[in-house]
Amino acid sequence: MLERFIQTSRYFNIQTVVRVCGDNPFIAPEEIDRLIYFFKKNPCDYACNHQDKLNSGYADGFGAEIIPSSVLYKIETLTQDKRHREHVTTYILENPKKYRLMSVPAPEGLHYPNLCFDINTTDDKKLLETLIEIGVTINSNAFEIVNLYLSQFHEPKNKN
């Protein structure tokens, strides 16, 4: 994956990459906008709001990661470890002393770090189906999804 990001960045002369995880069906554009705004105001080597990385407080599954292409180019020269090359940001997160890492603090109403909206298992798929049955749509924002979840289940489930 790292190589794909680098090739694409070079081909299109991209300065900054916003990475959304494919197992997140409830991507929230407003939370990605919040991340981009945060990144512009707080220049760093990596920022995120897609899960509770770096103690952001976010539920897993709404946001993204953002990283300058120049950092990806540097990582390419620093590691040949298969894991680092398969998972685009693993090297950065495992080497926090080398990079300026930041996270967007979750706003009130989204501060549920134990909630997980990823789809990785059959149980995750069942949860997705239940949320759709109770009213979540492609147009639902992150606040609506969390509120519908809490109204149905009354307490956050623990992450796996």
Regions found by a protein language model. Give the residues of each.
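Short, acidic Gly/Pro/Ser/Thr-rich loop/turn segments
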Residues: 125-126, 135
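Short, flexible active-site recognition loops that position polar ligands and cofactors
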Residues: 115-118, 134-136
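Conserved core of the sugar-phosphate nucleotidyltransferase
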Residues: 3-4, 27-115, 126, 130, ...
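Cytochrome P450 catalytic domain signature, combining two hallmark sequence patches
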Residues: 82, 135-140
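Short, conserved phosphate/pyrophosphate- and ester-handling motifs at nucleotide-, phospho-/glycolipid
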Residues: 121
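Short beta-strand-to-loop acidic/aromatic patch adjacent to the donor-nucleotide binding site
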Residues: 9, 14-22
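Short, conserved alpha-helix that lines the donor NDP-sugar binding/gating region
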Residues: 2-10
